[in-house]
Amino acid sequence: APHLVVWFAPDLRRGYAWWFPLPGPRANVGFGIHRSSGVKVGDMGRIWADLLERPGVQAVLCPDARPEDRHKAWPIPARVDGLPRTAHRVFFVGDAVAATDPMTGEGIAQALVSGRSAADAIGEAGATNPAAAAAVYERAVDHHLTTDHRFARFLAKLLEHPVGARGALRAADTNDWTRRNFARWMFEDYPRALVLTPSRWRRGMFTGPGAFRDDGAGVTAIERTDSPV
């Protein structure tokens, strides 16, 4: 498949599996799952082997697809609202401040925002006034990241339950607009809690081109099943 594919399945609840293309005849395939699901680290190898055999994944994989290396897993910290952000002249950004999304585990956008906010804070307050710069940075993290983080954590809890997960996907599959913007929202083409923070609203926030592929035939597909993938 030349585009991003995402699968939601009961045994990956509060998580998902993905496929996205890489340069050449290569792709990144994997899954993420929240620790609160009760799945043990030792079980992830079994889930991985089973995942590759599921019909929905087999339909996307090439018949002769082969892994380049052994599969790997690692924990992703997501608690930007609970860690120190500064230590005198040191500002923590990205993973160092656990600025990742608790629903998807993504963190590239958050890392960029936190790094830029730290630089802007120093520029605004001056390098000779670390206390003032720290205060500016703290406010920026709250403005740009904390509300999104808490909103995503709340939504992730809803998705733990079958009724919540099915309801969310049915709503997202209502029409082309909801499908397109669900994909954009899910993978953070705009801030997670944008609709709840009017201070970040801007004209065209839901209608811009976005960081997705548009070939004229649609931009996303949602696969919804009652059985695993």
Language-model segments: residues:
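Active-site substrate-recognition segment that forms the wall
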Residues: 6-38, 92-93
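FAD/FMN-dependent oxidoreductases across multiple families
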Residues: 13, 35-122, 127
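C-terminal helical "tail/cap" subdomain of flavin- and related membrane-associated enzymes
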Residues: 120-229
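Residue-level detector of alpha-helix boundaries and kinks
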Residues: 4, 100-103, 107, 153, ...
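Short secondary-structure transition/capping segments
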Residues: 33-52, 170-188
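FAD-binding core/adjacent interface of flavoenzyme oxidoreductases
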Residues: 1
